Amino acid sequence: MKYLDVRLPEFANEFQQVLSRGKMDMKEVSSLVQELLDEIRTEGLDALKKHIARFDKWEVKSFEDLRISPKECLNAYNQLSSELKSALHLAYDRIYAFHRKQKMQSWIDCEENGNILGSKFTPMERAGLYIPGGKAAYPSSLLMNAIPAIVAGVKEIVVCSPTPHNQANPLVLAALHLCGITEVYKVGGASAIGLMAYGCKEIPKVDVITGPGNIFVACAKKLVFGEVNIDMVAGPSEIAIIADSQANPLYIAYDLLSQAEHDEMASSILISDSAPLIESVQKHIEQILPSMPRAEIAGASIKNRAVMIYTRNLQESIEIANAIAPEHLEVLTTTPFDTLPYIKHAGAIFLGEHSSEPIGDYLAGPNHTLPTGGSARFFSPLGVEHFMKKSSIIAFSATALEEVGESCALLAQSESLSAHAQAVLTRLDSIKSKRE
């Protein structure tokens, strides 16, 4: 892991590497991804068969082979222990309750002159959710992507998830049953994104695609944007922790490792004005890491992507965190809420020593699909709004048009758009003639 000290002259250059973490160079994969997307667009099911044989190592003989039936999902759910069922239901209920508060309501404003203005919020008709299935398959990702769509009122929700060697993850199947999703396809990678974006003879296209994935999935989402809407282009997972001298180093070590075990490319960053704390955290990581089930993955992440940043004071720690704009930001200080007004850029903010980032991953309620790689400066967490669209409502009365019509025509004429102006002036003439 790297150790950076803001006091040293080389800090600025070294910190630039932290700011460029998670940046995905898609040049090397974009041509392959575009080729796969083009094949899906033109060949449909035949292309899917080729791609699945190539990447997931099993043979698709018919369209039905691609589908996961509701019965399979029910069977997987029934085979769960009662404790795991309860945990899934608890997560579902908490995530649903949080996202229900996000749902936007249509509104109309009626002015005295009869002018009516408003916004109408409508759910997307068909949403596509991508659920990873590589080194680990996450039922939590299914819940986090499906529940906002359910709350939004999306009528048709389709899920695509890879099944290497035609083996589906039973926990994901159980979560599908819990969410009531019945249209599920055993397709992964760029092929899945293409299938949902373009559709084929057997499967209609979707309106929006959400969900995390590897660089091929991210590249495919970027390429199909405009054909459909997407949530964001996300990269490897990351965490930054602001901590003072009173923070618990063992808590910090586990929270950093919780990101490192996701992926070799995950970033774990500690920002503190306490050198003894940083040293203690490093020692705890060294002690814990060898016994972790995913020690190889976590070890590679810690070795190559973990950073300890030693600052002068808490204010500087906050400034560093804002520059990083992390996916997850923990604040482990004596008075964490005092820092909240000064935090500008983070996907999710965890305040206090009991607000461990994994709580947010599973069942706190807020979504765990978050912007990465510094994109929290302009992207937001996945939410109900990603599955809804807004239409403006405009209804002018004759009186309202008379009040502003000439100004509107003048603006149109200033832009040399004569038909725009005449469309308004003709109506004004008609209103005047009726009154005469």
Swiss-Prot record:
Substrate binds at residues 237, 259, 262, 328, 361, 415, 420. Binds 1 zinc ion per subunit. InterPro entries: Ald_DH/histidinol_DH (IPR016161), Histidinol_DH_CS (IPR001692), Histidinol_DH_monofunct (IPR022695), Hstdl_DH (IPR012131). CDD domains: Histidinol_dh. The keyword Hydrolase does not apply. The active site is at residues 327-328. GO terms for cellular component: cytosol. GO terms for molecular function: histidinol dehydrogenase activity; NAD binding; zinc ion binding. Keywords: Amino-acid biosynthesis, Histidine biosynthesis, Metal-binding, NAD, Oxidoreductase, Zinc. It catalyses: L-histidinol + 2 NAD(+) + H2O = L-histidine + 2 NADH + 3 H(+). It holds the Pfam family Histidinol_dh. Its EC number is 1.1.1.23. Zn(2+) binds at residues 259, 262, 361, 420. GO terms for biological process: L-histidine biosynthetic process. PROSITE patterns: HISOL_DEHYDROGENASE (PS00611). Its cofactor is Zn(2+). Pathway: Amino-acid biosynthesis; L-histidine biosynthesis; L-histidine from 5-phospho-alpha-D-ribose 1-diphosphate: step 9/9. Belongs to the histidinol dehydrogenase family. NCBIfam families: hisD (TIGR00069). Catalyzes the sequential NAD-dependent oxidations of L-histidinol to L-histidinaldehyde and then to L-histidine. This is Histidinol dehydrogenase. It comes from Helicobacter hepaticus (strain ATCC 51449 / 3B1). The gene is hisD.
